[in-house]
Amino acid sequence: MRILVWGATGSVGSRVVAEATARGHSVTSVSRSGPDHLRGDASNPEDVARLSAGHDVVISATRPQDGREGELVDTAKSLLIGLRGSGVRLVLVGGAASLIVPGSELTLMESPEFPAALLPIARACAAQYALVRSAEALDWTYVSPPALLEPGTRTGRYRKGYDHLVTDAAGESSISVEDFAVALVDEAEQAQHIRQRFTVGY
């Protein structure tokens, strides 16, 4: 399978590249900078169309800097335009804040415990998801991480959810970045959630 990864130098993207490569896929890694990657800007539809041509799946794991959260929506729009009608599937890494907290009717960002400092990125992720949901002429999958996503160990194990946070017996919602990458590459291979959002956790 030919997979193109946007945001290949980031925490999630670099692990997606490693996971997909280890499985024997042909991986093209793209970044705004870095000598070992193709140069490209995911917020430019022409770059998206040009670099994605000839691939089976695009996995986008870009993340904006603090204060530039609006780039999430701009980048999603660019990906949708650049891939429209191409036959290339899009697996897009999103946010967790719009997931519903189990046992409540509130989303994570609506819960009283949600840090105010994270509201800008949370709102941007919610807008990103709303935009992607309206996309036509494109097979997309939106993947929300759990509440806690940190570097750790690859176990190859995870559980899936859809609109609710995946939590363990202690009520924690987490996964290692390595296992999150496993879930992303699994979806690239299996195409189980076309035009759907899903989430994962332990």
Residue ranges and their predicted role:
Residues 33-86:
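NAD(P)H-binding glycine-rich loop region in Rossmannoid oxidoreductase-like domains
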Residues 3-23:
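N-terminal Rossmann NAD(P)H-binding glycine-rich loop of SDR-like oxidoreductase domains
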Residues 124, 173-185, 196:
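Substrate-positioning beta->alpha
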Residues 4, 28, 141:
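Conserved beta-strand positions in the Rossmann-like core of class I SAM-dependent methyltransferases
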Residues 130-151:
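Conserved beta-loop-beta element that borders a ligand/cofactor-binding pocket
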